[in-house]
Amino acid sequence: MPKLEQFEIKKYWQIFSGLSPSDNKVTHDQVAPILHNSKLEAGVLGKIWFLSDIDGDGNLDFEEFVICMRLIFDMVNQNITAVPDELPDWLVPGSKVELVRQRASQGGVAAASAAPASAGEAPEMEWYMSPEDRALYERLYQKCQTATDGSVGYQGVKPVVTEHFQKITQPELEQVWALVNPKGFAAIDRDPVMYLFHLLRQRSDVGAKIPAGVPASLGETFAKERVTTDIANEGQGAIRKSELHIASASRSNSARPKNENSDYSATAGTDWEVVQLQRELAALDSQLSDLKQQQESAPPTRAEVLREQFEGLLKFKQAQLSTSTNSSPAMNVLSLTEDIDSLEEQVTVLQHYLSTRSETLQQLQWEIQSLK
């Protein structure tokens, strides 16, 4: 397994920041698209998650995220043929050495993934759900933290599973979650949640074997597309290609000595919130620049053109009046006065219209400025 390079850690930081971590941690739901895109088996992903989540809080901080990404890419690029039972020393961050030792003393992955005790061979999973079972799972579903559309995320179902199926380990929950959520959605609908409880209950009560696939009759139910308004995760599907290049580039590097821990100093002092705000500011500046260009290139308004024409006509009539030598001055003066009055009324109307448009323009400029 090639050693972990600094350029690799920096790239993982960019991916981590793009997931919008909270308190410098990302949830399973946030990482789920990357896990799904790896195309690794659910059991493998469950083991990788367990190894990465060193403190066992169900989330990954940046150091744990690096471990998760590196194990995934090593499996995808076939740098390793199986996920190790324990993390190699060079992949363990110095701040978590003691936690890793404590977990190893408690049995590590072997203890976490041990199946419930049962006599003889583990029974097959039963997919049929009786009305009594459905009523029970409906009550459990009501305890989950649901979205407005009734969907449930991984973190929304996990507390209920922990409370009612205490024999279920996290890798087993990960495996069953992937089974009823084959497309790796951030949240699943009510029916997949019911089957999640159904499978976990059998696993917990009688040690039933978790199946590798689902019946064809349920495949469409579990893979059904959901309409989502969450734009935070857009573009995550494109992450995989760029990250795979990182792990591939490290194949030829020599392995780090076993007693050396990973150095995560490359991201010291980095503030992911600053990165996010800088991106938003750059986007707003671009929008403001486009609006200014449109304003400068816009043709004169109809009101401005008409005003210039009427002002020119007014000056012409005034010049005619001052130089008139007609024998009927009173009649000409009266006619010109009426023309001037009419023009002045029209100019007044146009000035009022121009003033209104100017106020509208000022309001738009104020809104543009507030975006910055």
From Swiss-Prot:
Its main location: membrane. It is a peripheral membrane protein. One of its GO terms (cellular component) is actin cytoskeleton-regulatory complex. InterPro entries: EF-hand-dom_pair, EF_Hand_1_Ca_BS, EF_hand_dom, EH_dom, End3. Residues 271-355 form a coiled coil. Residues 249-267 have a biased composition (Polar residues). The keyword ATP-binding does not apply. Residues 242-267 are annotated as: Disordered. PANTHER family: ACTIN CYTOSKELETON-REGULATORY COMPLEX PROTEIN END3, EH DOMAIN. Component of the PAN1 actin cytoskeleton-regulatory complex required for the internalization of endosomes during actin-coupled endocytosis. The complex links the site of endocytosis to the cell membrane-associated actin cytoskeleton. Mediates uptake of external molecules and vacuolar degradation of plasma membrane proteins. Plays a role in the proper organization of the cell membrane-associated actin cytoskeleton and promotes its destabilization. Component of the PAN1 actin cytoskeleton-regulatory complex. This is Actin cytoskeleton-regulatory complex protein END3. The lineage of its organism: Eukaryota, Fungi, Dikarya, Ascomycota, Saccharomycotina. The gene is END3.
